[in-house]
Amino acid sequence: MNRYKLKDLSLNKLEYGSGAAACEYDGSTRYVRITDIDNEGNLGEDVVSPNTVDDKYLLNDGDVLFARTGATVGKTYLYRASAGRCIYAGFLIRVVPNQELIRPDYLYYFTKSPQYKGFVQSSMKVVAQPNINAKQYGDLEFNVPSLSEQDSIIEKLKAVSTVIALRKTELLKLDELIKARFVELFSEYEWSTTIGNYIAELRGGKSLAGTEPCKNKVLKTGAATFGWFDPEQYKFLPQDYEPLQEHKVETGDVMISRMNTPELVGACSYVFEAPENMYYPDRLWKVITKNNANPIFIWQLLWDPEIRRQIKEKSGGTSGTMHNISKPKLLEIKCIDVPVTVQNDFADFVKQVDKSKVVVQNALKKADILFDSLMQTYFR
């Protein structure tokens, strides 16, 4: 086992990418930017080209890119030739692994380790936004085992990563099944009513944050952001504050984010199982439905593309990054008029799909725990 600095593992000096502007994809050269790399280390579907192509920034199979600035500083991408001809942008730094010392996959997996994450947190220079420069990355020092041991580690981590990816794909397919069923059942109904026809009240909570652990917790906006309730998105309430019962999160609730980014304002989720002692903040509304509405139907209705378009159109704000929507504007949004009996049939279908999701989520959780355990073992 040897110890190296990152700069000593790269065949080239750690280099910033191209300063070219992005333009429409030319069918030949893709421009890889920070925003194109997702949390799984994959490239997104928004394909663009650089307006000028300089071959010095062309990626070669096995190159590893490091994000040097912005909210995603520290994020990495392992380039493979199967991604096609690519040039990398200036907010990324390239490492060309010396494969006589380190496998590209091993370096990439290292960037998922607790040691690397600790380095990112301790190294960020925050001025207008977080930043880690090439020198800081180059001085990052870590243990590197023999190539044969690296190969063994890579094989095991890839096996678990494959299981994790499969489980995530299963969850996405189940989500798509619900969306497809919604379209199948409701596409023929008239857009002749408003959201207010289904909702009796939009009830906001109270946002307070304690400095110490407390049995009572308040949700963060992120609990509703991506369509599924995330009970891990919370803060502790002050120990001397007694929350109102009407602000409590309950099983069967629909919650709506009244303030978020322009794309996510109005995001909502459904609570299949409420955690104990959890309460609403003022940025999330608890939806009180009328007798003619099924909460699960309302949850899925609010994710309909046309509803999302109307919400975005009616929202606003003084900040370019945060928008909000008022209760009256949300309630006046046009929507389909569906009998509650049909809504209930759809809700029963969603509940059955959710049972399958729980099984997959539990399997995913076990795979995640195994992956984290292996990372702790291999990257000390």
Residue spans for each PLM region:
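A short beta-sheet element
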Residues: 33-34, 55-112, 246-303, 319, ...
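Non-catalytic DNA-recognition/assembly elements of restriction-modification systems
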Residues: 1-16, 40, 139-154, 169-206, ...
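Sequence-specific dsDNA recognition surfaces
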Residues: 4-20, 35-61, 197-208, 222-254
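Short coil/turn segments at secondary-structure boundaries
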Residues: 20-26, 122-124, 208-215, 314-315
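Short, solvent-exposed loop/turn positions at domain surfaces
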Residues: 50-53, 126, 165, 243, ...
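A short glycine-rich beta-alpha junction/loop motif
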Residues: 85-93, 102-105, 125-148, 277-285, ...
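ATP-grasp fold ATP-binding core
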Residues: 32, 219
